[in-house]
Design a protein with these regions (language model features):
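Short coil-to-helix segment of the ABC ATPase nucleotide-binding domain corresponding to the Q-loop/switch region
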Residues: 94-101
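Catalytic Walker B motif of ABC-type/P-loop ATPase nucleotide-binding domains
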Residues: 159-162
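Conserved ABC ATPase signature
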Residues: 133-138, 142-144
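A short, proline-enriched helix->beta-strand linker immediately N-terminal to the Walker B motif
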Residues: 153-157
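Helix-to-loop junction immediately C-terminal to a conserved catalytic motif
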Residues: 49
Length: 228
């Protein structure tokens, strides 16, 4: 599902954020990406959905060749890769319904399908009753749940979660993780960057640790491994 071979990413300022990454993530896997701040986790995550382009190497995501991909092909990749951000990135002037529908409208989904699918994903995140509200009428946890609903609206094969609980209190963080677990149980591949030691050590999954742009640890049912 996700393959990286000898992947490097060097920025114009000379910083090397990926220094020979090699990893194979299978269909349906749930993988935590951990490591110190500035270790290269965000670059690793962003290369998977082509927000960043690797300097050299090989990256395959669901049969898409990301190194040689043309910019015009990126939207096709992102139909198959959903992304959840720490800061939600909801459209503040649009309702909950409109935020989720927009993700499908841009890929020209039929209106009848959009309506049905919006309600399906809102049911998954337990927010059908908030469908007509604006983002600023929601709590932080509710906004993140809407962000997750939007990210899976197109039924992606891969879901990228970049610090999805970073701005949330502990109870709300567990609510978000329960939703991600349910999505994982339905067969979606999930790659989640996190600094949350308790979550990683409690909800056991594969753990990949990155330091100085290198994978230094890759363990099934792993531990967080860093002091916080």
């Amino acid at each position: 599902m996700i393959l990286m071979e000898d992947v490097y990413k060097k920025y114009p300022n000379g910083i090397t954020a990926a220094n020979g990454l090699n990893i194979n993530i299978g269909e349906g896997e749930f993988v935590y990406v951990v490591g110190p701040s500035g270790a290269g986790k965000s670059t690793f995550i962003k290369m998977i959905y082509r927000e960043e382009r690797a300097t050299k190497g090989k990256i395959i995501v669901d049969k898409f060749d990301l190194i040689n991909m043309k910019n015009r092909e990126i939207p096709y990749l992102r139909r198959n890769v959903g992304v959840v951000f720490q800061d939600y990135k909801l459209l503040q002037s649009k309702t909950v319904y409109e935020n989720i529908a927009y993700a499908m409208e841009v890929v020209e989904t039929e209106p009848s399908v959009i309506k049905e699918r919006v309600m399906e994903v809102l049911d998954l995140v337990n927010l059908k009753h908030k469908v007509r509200m604006l983002p600023d009428e929601l709590s932080g946890g509710e906004q993140q749940r809407i962000s997750i609903a939007r990210s899976i609206a197109n039924m992606p094969k891969v879901l990228i979660a970049d610090e999805p609980t970073g701005n949330l209190d502990p109870d709300t963080s567990w609510e978000i993780m329960n939703i991600l677990e349910e999505i994982s149980n339905r067969g979606t591949t999930i790659v989640m960057a996190t600094h949350n030691k308790e979550i990683v050590n409690t909800l056991k999954h594969r753990v990949v640790a990155i330091e100085n742009g290198r994978i230094v640890r890759d363990e099934q049912q792993g531990e967080y491994g860093y002091e916080v």
